[in-house]
Each structure stands twice: as C-alpha cells, then as structure tokens.
Amino acid sequence: MTIIEFDTALPEYAAPCERPVIQMLIDFCLRDDGKVSVWDGEELSVHGCSSKAHILKNLAQTEMDQVEAYDKDGNCRGWFSLIYHNGSENEPMIVISDYSYNEWTENVYRRLDGVFGGIEL
C-alpha cells in the first residue's frame, strides 16, 4: 500500500478528491528545476513559477486550467488540461481531461494513473 501525504486544503476550489492528483502532477512538473505556467482560460495566472504553494493557490480559480510544464532551460515539456468538478468524485484522475502527447507527458500521466487510476474515493 502506498501512503500519499498531501495538503488537504489546496487547490482551495478543487474537489477534495482531485487535490492529491493535482499536487502530485505539480511535483512532477517541478522536478529537475522545472517551472510551471498556468492559463486559466482568461490569462496566465502563473508564469514560469517554481513555487508549488504559489501554483496550487492559483489553480482552480476558474472551472478549468491548462498547466504548462517547462524544463530548466525554458523548453516546453508539455501541458495538462484540468477540468474541476467534472465527475471526479469517484475517479480522481478525471480532473486531467487532456494532455499534450509526448514521451514526457505520457510518462507523467502513467505514473499518476499508477497511483490514482481505478481508485474510488
């Protein structure tokens, strides 16, 4: 059994079952000096940030976000589209509605799915 520790309060407006998935996603994005930008559908609410707390505080302010991951040199690794309260009450991975398809994003998604896929909370 894997025990996952996470902040039960962030992102504040995400469903509680979505929070561990989102937090682990951000952890993967920030590995190896990565940076994250967040497009909330209206503006970049986060731009090139490496602070997990700042990123999480700015997620779920709208009904969806696009999380863009960058490596330490500023090259885009890929993006993940998050839609909040989208039927994830029983399946937390549903918060990730889409992602750019490449080796890096597929690896991140598979690792998240290995932890959270098929789990009903």
Could you tell me what each predicted segment is?
Residues M1-Y13, N90-L121:
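Mixed-charge, Lys/Arg-enriched low-complexity segments
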Residues T2-A60:
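Negatively charged, low-complexity tracts enriched in Asp/Glu with abundant Ser/Thr
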Residues R19, R31, R77, R110-R111, ...:
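Arginine residue identity/basic-tract feature
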Residues V36-R110:
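Acidic, low-complexity, intrinsically disordered interaction modules
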